[in-house]
Amino acid sequence: MSLKVAVLAGGDSAETAISRSSADEVLRSLGVRHLVELIELDENITKNITAFGPDVVFPVLHGPPGEDGTVQGYLEMLGLPYVGSDVRGSALAMDKYVAKTLFRQVGLPVLEDLLVSVVDAHESSAAISERFGSRVVIKPLRQGSALGVTRLPHGGDVSKSIMDARSYGDTVLVEPYFDGKEVTAGVLDLVGENKVVFPVTEIELPDGEWYDFRNRYEVGRSIHKIPATLPDHVLEDIANYATKAHECLGLRDLSRSDFLVSSTNEVVLLEVNTMPGMTPTSLYPDAARAAGLSFGDLVDKLVVNAVSRPRNVSYPLGA
């Protein structure tokens, strides 16, 4: 099946450069089998989409407004099928606090948290110290790629960390620091097929470092160990958690769940990404390849699935 595929990229998100890098890979691979066109998320998007007349849209967008339900709602108004989760699923996953609230309700292992939205960073700092002590992680509520995230494993300047996170939005999420391996599990969820969880991937980093923006996207800064070096029962638990998180938020097509695993094999779920990175250093495509699915076949399956999906299908929470 040869399709006209509009690949959306860019926009004014803090992750715009990553979006374009992901889109380049998607465009190159889809172009082997389909007629593709790169369309920028800007003021000319409606004109350019209308002129191209796509069968399906692949919104390769990271962070708001491309991954939070805004673009998804726009595409639904245009009546265009698209790859990825719908408006509701995208919005729920992007809001870390709301997502974690839903995760708790279905028994998924998540850390305690504190939502900070007051203007006074010093007042917020005092409340955080009283609740969690000095060892915390501070992150923007609705942002990806670890942008604005500060880890304070030995304590530190909480007020400054709050202000750094607030450069990506007024509301900040604070969690107690949890020491563990960073691992991830991708889900592929196609219409009429059983959900597939790709092999759990462990992220190996230079000593003392974590999977921040630099280590995510600079070639050679991290190693993806597939499968992760964990006991089989822990790998099975993580795969089950990833599936349950995907279903809990009512997601579809694809997602990637991020976890920490302690030295005693305690697992905590951090967040779920509805449009995982597709760059040369990204985790989701690597895990798909480890499962025997080439990048070209992966993106082809996603667009064919999207255009074949029955319209106006509801994906209930916890489905």
Labelled PLM ranges:
Residues 153-233, 237-240, 266-268:
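Phosphate-binding site of ATP-dependent enzymes
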Residues 116, 149-154, 187-190, 261-262, ...:
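Short beta-strand-to-turn element immediately C-terminal to the catalytic PLP-Schiff-base lysine
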Residues 3, 104-105, 231-319:
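ATP-dependent carboxylate activation and anion-phosphoryl transfer catalytic cores
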Residues 1-9, 49, 92-181, 191:
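Active-site nucleotide/adenylate-binding loops and adjacent lid/helix of ATP-dependent enzymes
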Residues 38-42, 176, 183-184, 250-264:
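A short glycine-rich, hydrophobically flanked beta-strand micro-motif that places a catalytic Asp/Glu
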Residues 1-88, 92-98, 105, 117-127, ...:
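ATP-binding N-terminal substructure of ATP-dependent carboxylate-amine bond-forming enzymes
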Residues 36, 81-82, 110, 136, ...:
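Hydrophobic beta-strand scaffold residues
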